[in-house]
Structures are given as C-alpha cells and as structure tokens.
Curated annotation (Swiss-Prot):
Transmembrane feature ranges: none
Disordered: annotated segments: 1-54
HAMAP family given in the database record: Ribosomal_uL15
Family designation: Belongs to the universal ribosomal protein uL15 family.
Name listed for the protein in its UniProt record: Large ribosomal subunit protein uL15
Encoding gene (name): rplO
Pfam assignment, any one: Ribosomal_L27A
GO biological process: one example: translation
Source domain of life: Bacteria
Alphabetized UniProt keyword annotations: Ribonucleoprotein, Ribosomal protein, RNA-binding, rRNA-binding
Lineage: Bacteria, Bacillati, Actinomycetota, Actinomycetes, Mycobacteriales
InterPro entries per the UniProt record, alphabetical: Ribosomal_uL15, Ribosomal_uL15/eL18, Ribosomal_uL15/eL18_sf, Ribosomal_uL15_bac-type, Ribosomal_uL15_CS
Record-level GO cellular component terms: cytosolic large ribosomal subunit
Keyword Membrane: no
Subunit (UniProt): Part of the 50S ribosomal subunit.
Length: 146
C-alpha cells in the first residue's frame, strides 16, 4: 500500500491546543503562571527596567549632530598611489583604477595630493584637490574632470 498526501496525519499528542491561562480555577487559573505577589504578578514591568540600576539607554550618550543624506561620497586616491600603481605613467582613468583595485566600480573618484609624482600622467577623475592638480601639472601631466 502506498502512502498518499491526504493520508498523512500528525503523530498523536504532537498537536495540542494552546493553554489559555487565567480563565478559571480548573485550568491554570488564579496566578496564571505569574507566581504569587510582587510587581510582576500585579502589572507589566517596562522592558527597559533594570531593577533600579541606571538603564542602559540612559547610561549611553545621546547622539549629537546630524548626517547629511544628500552628501556625495568620493573614493580617495592619492597621487602617491597613482605613482606606485602606474610607474611608467600614461593615461589613467577611473576604469584603470578599478582594474588595479584602487577604487570600487561605480564610485566617484577624488584625487588628493599626498605622496610624490615624478612621471607624466594624464588623469581623468571626478574631482581633484589643489595640491594634486599642482603635482600632476608640474610632472608634465594633464588633469581632466568628469
């Protein structure tokens, strides 16, 4: 005989009805699982209450200031990083920086002037700092903003 889906039944005793407490002396009435006397037997205690100890939400400092939701975040690449990643120079764009692992793809790139640049590099990025512009042009390269 094969078992069919409509023949399946839960094991006896596995499905018992939910016990409704506090509904008469005969069935978990009277204290209804709350024990005897005390605050927790008589009313609900707030979840933040820690027995008189200063609660954690009052011990921690308040959050101050605010975070601008419309701020544009740039991935930062320093001139020194470009000199290290491209020692022979040439043209460097966002795609080349992504390929070398300097920045993540689909991100805005800002070039900063930390480090030294000695080779001629033509860089294309979204933003440049003043010192980065100076170093790139001093080395004979060019700067192009997207």
């Amino acid at each position: 005989m094969t078992i069919k889906l409509h023949d399946l039944r839960p094991a006896p005793g596995s499905k018992t009805p939910r016990t409704r407490v506090g509904r008469g002396e005969g069935s978990k009435g009277k204290t209804a699982g709350r024990g005897t006397k005390g605050t927790k037997a008589r009313k609900q205690v707030p979840t933040t209450f820690e027995g008189g100890q200063m609660p954690i939400h009052m011990r921690l400092p308040k959050l101050k200031g605010f975070r601008n939701r419309f701020r544009t975040e740039y991935e930062i690449v320093n001139v020194g990083d470009i000199a290290r990643l491209f020692p022979e120079g040439g043209t460097v764009g966002v795609d080349e920086l992504v390929a070398k692992g300097a920045v993540r793809k689909n991100s805005l790139v800002k070039v900063l002037g930390d480090g030294k640049l000695t080779v001629k590099v033509d860089i294309t990025a979204h933003k440049f700092s003043g010192s980065a512009r100076e170093q790139i042009t001093a080395a004979g390269g060019s700067v192009t903003e997207l």
